[in-house]
């Protein structure tokens, strides 16, 4: 948002509007509460398979206090919703975790209770992905300690268009809170974004 405000030239493109999609963040305290109230650390830190860990997480309960907020978000967003990870380690300088954890997308439905069920499953799936075998292996390879990882979750409208019954995102990207190579009047704390047409897999996989 700061970059958009300080670069008015973003608004000079005919037929295009550059703005931040509607977004809700579930902070790390929700993750802590979910893990502790459902006693999930034992299975999460075990050698259980990814499927077994996911099964336990899907059977767990999210805090009831979130339900009203989810319905409010559904009223504000009339398109599919991306459910993305936002962990403490994903913005690390030398060992970023971007692309390690799961991301989900749910469709927009008139049945808001069906959306609520899908959203809850997606959030639990993001939480579970912290403890999958690939995540643990990457954690060990980068000399990080898994029980110190904290997970926030971002709920964000997917801006795009529908073609032949399928919904396609316009542009996706990876945001970094620090830009280590600022140019001109830019500051490191302004951050930087890597953008690509469609889904962000191209960038996360190392595309330039």
Each model region followed by its residue ranges:
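A conserved helix-loop-beta module that forms one wall/lid of the active-site cleft
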Residues: 1-46, 50-64
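Conserved mixed alpha/beta core segments that line enzyme active sites in large multi-domain catalysts
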Residues: 1-12, 61-208
């Amino acid at each position: 948002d700061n970059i958009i405000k300080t670069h008015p030239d973003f608004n000079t493109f005919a037929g295009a509007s550059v703005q931040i999609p509607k977004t809700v963040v579930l902070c790390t305290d929700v993750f802590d509460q979910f893990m502790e109230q459902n006693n999930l650390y034992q299975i999460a830190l075990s050698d259980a398979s990814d499927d077994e860990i996911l099964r336990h997480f899907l059977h767990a309960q999210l805090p009831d206090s979130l339900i009203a907020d989810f319905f409010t978000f559904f009223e504000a967003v009339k398109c599919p919703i991306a459910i993305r990870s936002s962990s403490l380690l994903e913005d690390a300088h030398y060992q970023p975790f971007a692309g390690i954890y799961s991301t989900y997308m749910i469709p927009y439905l008139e049945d808001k209770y069906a959306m609520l069920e899908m959203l809850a499953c997606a959030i639990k799936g993001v939480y579970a992905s912290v403890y999958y075998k690939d995540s643990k292996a990457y954690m060990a390879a980068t000399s990080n300690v898994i029980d110190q990882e904290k997970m926030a979750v971002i709920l964000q409208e997917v801006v795009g268009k529908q073609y032949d019954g399928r919904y396609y995102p316009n542009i996706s990207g990876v945001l970094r809170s620090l830009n280590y190579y600022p140019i001109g009047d830019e500051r490191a704390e302004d951050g930087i974004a890597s953008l690509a047409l469609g889904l962000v897999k191209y960038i996360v996989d190392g595309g330039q």
